[in-house]
């Protein structure tokens, strides 16, 4: 009951945040995924493991689908011009528009963001399930027993995931400053970020696990 109330509160805050402050709100997606995970409470470890395997397959399929969609869009002659025009219009509204115009645009963008939940929702579900797995296997509760694992995760994050995240940041900033430029590279970086982002987050967790181990 407490967890359900917290999810409802998170959903309410996410909806307000997405419509009034930032259309890229992630709290709503977290809440919706949390309700899905709540239905799996009490499952046995074999059932959870099957859910993890299924969610991995779904995410692999979605990643391939996104790659095909991006390749198709970026090869369209007028796609770059349309994308640049949309970015310039959004920038004009956010900097010169009144409160009503900005709010309307933000609500429209938030609705479009939520419509993509079927694409990024499974990724969040997989991360949640990996958290459950990490607790069940003792990776989080007994990190001292899994030093080698956390060190490998940290090394992968620093030497692989971090450079890829920096590359995405560079491409995203370049495209934001010059939206009329070719968007192929930023879309490629965004696709890579689907894997590099969670990998870097896992490296952050590894830092806490290894540091906390030394403190205790």
Region spans (language model):
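Alpha-helical transmembrane segments of multi-pass membrane proteins
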Residues: 30-35, 125-128, 195-206
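Structural signal for the C-terminal ends of transmembrane alpha-helices
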Residues: 39-45, 132-143, 208-216
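Alpha-helical transmembrane segments of multi-pass integral membrane proteins
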Residues: 180-216
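Long hydrophobic alpha-helical segments that form multi-pass transmembrane helix bundles
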Residues: 54-132
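Hydrophobic alpha-helical transmembrane segments of multi-pass membrane proteins
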Residues: 19, 23, 114-125, 191-199
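Transmembrane alpha-helix/helix-exit interface in multi-pass inner-membrane proteins
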Residues: 161-175, 199-201
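Interfacial segments of alpha-helical transmembrane regions
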Residues: 49-54, 141-160
